[in-house]
């Protein structure tokens, strides 16, 4: 049980770190690209504002 709780806390910390890093380095979060060597991960957010 303690190991699961520790893993959950670690996952939350990693997610928060990624979000904060994206907020600091990007003007918006509609497109985020991470490149490592030959691997690229691209995340796109599509949304329509409500009228």
From Swiss-Prot:
Belongs to the Hok/Gef family. Keywords: Cell inner membrane, Cell membrane, Membrane, Toxin-antitoxin system, Transmembrane, Transmembrane helix. It is a single-pass membrane protein. Probably inactive in strain K12 MG1655 due to a genetic locus rearrangement, the locus for its antisense antitoxin RNA is missing. Toxic component of a type I toxin-antitoxin (TA) system. When overexpressed kills cells within 2 minutes; causes collapse of the transmembrane potential and arrest of respiration. The keyword Cell membrane applies. The gene is hokD. It comes from Escherichia coli (strain K12). It holds the Pfam family HOK_GEF. It is found in: Cell inner membrane. GO terms for cellular component: membrane; plasma membrane. PROSITE patterns: HOK_GEF. This is Toxic protein HokD. The chain crosses the membrane at residues 5-25.
């Amino acid at each position: 049980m303690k190991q699961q709780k520790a893993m959950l806390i670690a996952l939350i910390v990693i997610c928060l770190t990624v979000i904060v890093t994206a907020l600091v380095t990007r003007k918006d979060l509609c497109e985020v690209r991470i490149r490592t060597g030959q691997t690229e991960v691209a995340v796109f957010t599509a949304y329509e504002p409500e009228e």
